[in-house]
Structures are given as C-alpha cells and as structure tokens.
Amino acid sequence: MTTASAASERAVRQRLVRVARGLEAGDLLVRGAQVVQPATGEVFGADVLVAEGRVAALVGPGLGVRAARTVEARGAYLAPGFLDAHIHIESSLLTPARFAAAVLPRGTTAVVAEPHETVNVMGLSGLRWMLEAGKGSGLRVFGSVPSSVPASPFECGGAVLDAAEVAEALRLPGVLGLAEMMNYPGVLNLERGAWEVLDAGYGGRIDGHAAGVAGRDLQAYAAAGPHSDHEATTPEEARERLRAGLWLMVREGSAARNLEALLPVLRERPRRAMLVSDDVSVDELLSLGHLDRLLRACVAGGLHPADAVALVTCNPAEYWGLHDLGLVAPGYHADFVLLRDLERFEVLDTFVGGVEAQAGSETPPLPGGGVNLGPSWATATFEVPASWPVMQVRPDQITTGVGAPGSGDARLVVADRYGRGEHAACWTSGTGLTGGALAISLLHDAHHVAVLGGSNADVRAAGRALEAMGGGVVVVAGGEVRSNLPLPYAGLMSDLPPQEAAARLSEVTAAARVLGCTLPYPVTTLSFLGLSVIPALKLTPRGLLDVGAWQLLPRETVRVGAEG
C-alpha cells in the first residue's frame, strides 16, 4: 500500500470510528433489520449504520442513531451480499454489465470471474477487457488468471498463455490468484509447461480442477499446490477432497448440477465449503435465479439458513482473501441484501457500497474474435472413422459416456474457428436430434465451432451462418436459418438486455426442439462436448480424444455420415 492510499484508508477508518461512536452522522441507516450473521450462525435484530460505503456499526433498535438517509427494513432479513467464487461470465452469453443486470436483483454483489473463454479467443487482452468491463458493471468483478490456455496439448485455440504471461497477469489489479488448474495429467506427470504455470501461482491462491481424480493421484494433485476443487459429483468425492485439505466448491450450474448429490456433505457443516455456479445461462439466471436459488435448495435440504448463507458469503470471501467482504460487520464493505424470508430468499433490495445497486449500461469494445472456418468448409464432408466409439451425451452433466461404434443417432462436428481449416466428426447418442443442425461458436475451451447435425449441407450452412454473425448460436434446417442469437463479443457474449437475450436463446432452444433435440439446455450441454480435460470422450478439430487414456483415437477406415 502506498503512503497516499494508506492515508486515504486511515481517513475512512477514522470516520467509521466517529460514526460508530455517535460523534458524526452516518450516510445510511437501515433500521429494523434481522441481521443474518453467518460467522456465528445467528439471526438477530439490529440497525445497520453505514458510512463511506462501509458498515460503521450494528446497533440496537431505537438508540436514536443519526444518518443522512434511512431505509426502513421493517423486519426484513439483512444478509451479506452473495459472492460467486467461481464463474465464467461468458457462459451466461452476456457481457459483464448485462450479467450484472441479471444477478444484482438476485442478491449477488461480487463474483470471481474466470475468463478463460475470452482469453482462449483473445489472449491476455481478453482478461484485461473482462476486468475493465467489470469495473462499470455495478458488480464487484474480481478475476483469476486462466492457468490452462490451451486447456490441454490436444487443443489449439486463438491464443497461448505461457507462464511468463500468467505471471504478468497475476500482477494486474483485481486479480486474486491462479484459476482452475485443469491440466491435471500435466501436473501428475510433471510436465514442464504445467509446472511452470504452477510456479507462477505459488504464493497466492491456486484453484483446482480435478475431475475424476481420486486416491493417490488426488493426494499428489493436492500436494502440487491447488487449494480447491469444484469437480466433485458424489459425497465420496467431496469428502475425499475435504480430507485432502482442498476447499470444496459445490457446483450447480446449467451444465453440471451437483448440489443435490452433495447436500449430505454440506449437512455435515464442513468448514471449508462454498457454492459456485461455474457456468449458468441467461435463461436460467432469469427463470431460476443465481446463488439465491442454491440457497433455497440448501435450506430445503436441511441446512440452517445462516449456514447456507455462509457458503456464498464469508466462506468464499475467506478463500479468496477478500477480507472486507462476506459479513455485515464494522469495517466491512456495505454490500448486503434485504430478504423477505430465509426459505425462498426473495430479494427486496441489493446494496453495493452502501447504495442501492444498479447495473452499468456500457460495455467497452472488444475488437476481433470472429469465426473463420477457412475456404475448405464450402465443400467439406464430415466422415467418421468406423472404429470410433459413440459419445454418450448426458443431460445436466459435462462428462460423457462411451458407446459401441455404430450406435449413435446424431453427428457432432467440431471445426477450428481460427482459419486453420481443421475439423473432425463423431457420432453421439442422447441428444434426440433427428435433422437440421444446431451450431455454436463457444465450444469449451478453445471455443471452436461445434455443430450437432444431420446432413453435410445443413452442417455447412450452420457454420457459414456463424461466420456471418461473427459468432453465436444458430439453428438451421433445410439449409435455412430458423433461429439465431448473435454473440459479437469474441463470439461468446451479447450486449442485449438479459430479457431479450434470454428470449432469443429460448427461441433457439424451441427451434432445436422442433428438430427432435431433447436436451434441457442444448446450447450449454453442446458447449462442453469438446472440453478435453473432462472424461470420457471429447471431440476436437484434430479428432476424438479419449480423456482417460490421454490420447487421440486413430483415424482409421471411415464411413461417411449423412449425405447431402
């Protein structure tokens, strides 16, 4: 801290002292609240006095406290603002300001964004853009530095973030640590590149990502330095991570829903646990909610409300070293939410820095990041090796199963979006798609184009439609576009108001339903079918990857997919 900033901090703190002692009037008084204190598990009546954007004091009702402005809580519950400790804002399909407009009314006041989607497309400039866009969003947007760009040696996106750039990014204001270390095979096999990135992160927080890792391998992974994991899907996996000293991030998003399965562990009141959404789409944010919906599920599942609130407030704040967030207590930032009850968690109002929260209205430009499938796309056919197994797609999960060759019902094509002209195809089962094509430009993590479709003509038409839009989501049938959602920010995000973006996405989903698709969230599920660090089979432009064996399957004798 510089001398000037220390002097400024001292001035703020000294005013808080004067206001707390009643020597000066505060800026805001929230009178007649029931304060939720997750640090002690209590709920108690108090008036909350705010000055300089921070809590000055919690005082007993009726003590004649002075403030420039008073908000009557009338017995409403006052909880700390909710903090999502691990989220990819891009998965909402919204820019940070539009994302804020969707989640501030749900009580979310801060997020730790992991922008490896934008960084895979744009490089380090994508991280800088996310932090800058976050400043004007109305939310407190912190960042973590992507550790795996590309996610594995089998992916090739728009950028490579080496250890030197990771170290540079870790010094950026607003960055809290190293993001999910997804390349766990590289960690376990002592690969130089993975360990150079770990070297850059030592001394700070290192997020983990260890899907399916167990036993001695999990012990080894934890010994390498990661501090957390959000990939547990069973109580046994969750307890094993806690016993290994890892913080447990319980994930509940649009593609992976693990909260119900892990509730038995949360009822055991583990000290080092939190709730995260990871990836959640705009339509789900508006219809179901954000962290508020996870709190509803926790309380319905038997947790005490204060214990549930701790999972989205003081616990994630402690994990990330945000010492002035996560509690309604003297000296803490006055980020809090007024709730009608502690069962439905209906939000009455949200405050950030002691004022009613408002989302920003402007997004900085993000040039580049379009879609270029290359000249060969115009005549491409999408052949599948006869020996390749079928990728079994699972609703509400980002893992896939393995089916016998020849048992699939819809073809998946993944094509390089950066002009290299590479593509591959495999058969899938479980999507229900019987014709036409659903295409996206947001295939994790390199964000290539993924097309789930029938005829070669529809697959090609869907890809060309994405090129024309600069990226997005599109449904094609009979060579014609039936519905689309352009995502002009890096081919990942829209700056439409959340309600409008959600309506367009719902139209896309409805159009996919007409083609037979049965996936509850087809765009989100499709977006994970290329993530090369999640078992069991994933498709890249270079071929079908057996994640467990950590190798691309050989391209042998081919059989042509649907003609046309």
From Swiss-Prot:
A molecular function (GO) term: adenine deaminase activity
Cofactor(s) demanded: Mn(2+)
Keywords: Hydrolase, Manganese
Catalytic reactions of this protein: adenine + H2O + H(+) = hypoxanthine + NH4(+)
Enzyme class: hydrolase
GO biological process, one term: adenine catabolic process
InterPro entries xrefs: Adenine_deam (IPR006679), Adenine_deam_C (IPR026912), Amidohydro-rel (IPR006680), Metal-dep_hydrolase_composite (IPR011059), Metal_Hydrolase (IPR032466)
EC number: 3.5.4.2
Family the entry assigns: Belongs to the metallo-dependent hydrolases superfamily. Adenine deaminase family.
Name under which the protein is recorded: Adenine deaminase
